Amino acid sequence: MHIGSSLALFWGAILLGYAARRARFVTLTFAPQMTRWLATWVAPPVALLAMWANEFTRLPVISLPFIGLAVSCASLAPAWWLMRRWRLSKPRAGSWLLSAFFSNVGFLGALVAFAVWGERAYGLCTLYFLFFGLGVYTVGYGIGDRYGASVPVESPGARQLELWRWTPMVGTLAGVALSWRGVPRPVVLTAINHALIPLMTAAYLFIVGTTMHMSRVGRFWREGLWMSAIMLVYAPLVGAALGAWWGYRHLPDPLVWRVVLLESAMPTAIT
């Protein structure tokens, strides 16, 4: 899989989903039901196999999720300043802050890494965005509680349970454990995961397309330009600085450093 085909898959799946919604081929319940099914049955084994293909014996590699979390938290600073300057109302303020915190490290970042550098890079990206699930149920819900409904709809304990039920967290940790113990991965699983990764990504992106409303994009051109500056200029500088400080540039395997640079330069998430 090459970079051109990965980008074609990315946009093609989104546009197909958007066309399906416009043609009313899917119902309102399709997106949440399909997302839950993929997160329960497909994402965990894909994460397990991708993580199993890597070597997690060095501390700097294990620290990747913390670098991802630090980059996302740092992106909140300029977003917060602009939110106060523009005096955004509560719902818009919450959406703005969440857009700054969550970047497209999964659907786009991991797919590009897989296309350019292979399955090991995909596994490192999976480790990098391990913070994503934790961020949803901590920072994400925290922003939602403050700028959305006045009363939280779930307790912190219930949210943590959802984290383990509906994300590839278990598969990720199982793959790290197998790699750490030095258990050899059967060769046949490589071909299986090489097929599952683009198929799963395409399915997720199709779901995203069924929830998009293109007519609303032009109304927020100012926010879009500033968010692009945060995600594509400011965040990569933060990621490069943190990665260099943590010693990624001097690791024998340059793939870790490349993954940090790639993932910190991703646009805002689209889910």
Outline where the language-model segments fall.
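Alpha-helical transmembrane segments of multi-pass small-molecule/ion transporters
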Residues: 1-271
